[in-house]
Swiss-Prot record:
It comes from the Eukaryota. Belongs to the peptidase T1B family. It comes from Caenorhabditis elegans. It holds the Pfam family Proteasome. It is found in: Cytoplasm; Nucleus. Keywords: Cytoplasm, Nucleus, Proteasome. The gene is pbs-3. PROSITE patterns: PROTEASOME_BETA_1, PROTEASOME_BETA_2. This is Proteasome subunit beta type-3. GO terms for cellular component: cytosol; nucleus; proteasome core complex, beta-subunit complex. Coiled coil: none annotated. PANTHER family: METALLOPROTEASE TLDD, PROTEASOME SUBUNIT BETA TYPE-3. InterPro entries: Ntn_hydrolases_N, Proteasome_beta_3, Proteasome_bsu_CS, Proteasome_sua/b, Proteasome_suB-type. CDD domains: proteasome_beta_type_3.
Length: 204
């Protein structure tokens, strides 16, 4: 078994009309043994920018600490909130610096910029960025998510529609991926607020 799928976990993000959704499952395991059922893989960076970390969760915790350190340093120097595009480049540089002994985690960035334009991207373990305009997914359930997201995603979806599409996509993934599960948490980021919803799913 690959170290990338050792602890399991899936993160997905979708872009809408001045809104984005990012969701993850809640399971952390040791291969097929479930260790905990409340492991959130999505973390707040600013009020409008969130990062999801799939892969080996020990490395994900280390990467998160480094991301927050660099983000705080950036905001002290620049005296402004970090944009999602800048954060993705920062994480990409961090990953590429460690390419010869890379962190076993796949980061995903989702958020709104200063004009409330949605931005989503994901990257591999050495920081190669993929930034489509529709949806991204990382983790053990990625192969199950992409086709489902293709079916649910529409252009210019409003927050309620986007939440429904993201929630249905991750629930469909949790039905099929044995390394993810025990419910999901969905963050809907709009220009005014962030809604956090916890969804029940299969408990096996």
């Amino acid at each position: 078994m690959s170290i990338m799928s050792y602890t399991g976990g899936t993160v997905v993000a979708m872009a809408g009309d001045e809104c984005v959704c990012i969701a993850s499952d809640l399971r952390i395991g040791e291969q097929m043994t479930t260790i905990a059922t409340d492991q959130k893989k999505v973390h707040k960076v600013t009020d409008k920018v969130y990062v999801g970390l799939a892969g080996f969760q020990s490395d994900a915790r280390t990467v998160l600490e480094k991301i927050m350190f660099r983000k705080n340093l950036y905001e002290l120097r620049e005296n402004r909130n970090i944009k999602p595009q800048v954060l993705s480049e920062m994480i990409s540089n961090l990953a590429y610096q460690h390419r010869f002994g890379s962190y076993f985690t796949e980061p995903l960035v989702a958020g709104l910029d200063d004009t409330n334009k949605p931005y989503i991207c994901c990257m591999d373990t050495i920081g190669c960025v993929s930034a489509p305009r529709d949806f991204v997914a990382v983790g053990t359930g990625q192969e199950y998510l992409l086709g489902v997201c293709e079916n649910f995603w529409r252009e210019n979806m409003k927050p309620d529609e986007l939440f429904e599409a993201t929630a249905q996509s991750i629930l469909s993934c949790l039905e099929r991926d044995a390394a993810s599960g025990w419910g999901a948490v969905v963050y809907t980021i709009t220009k005014d607020k962030v809604n956090v919803s916890t969804i029940k799913a299969r408990m096996d």
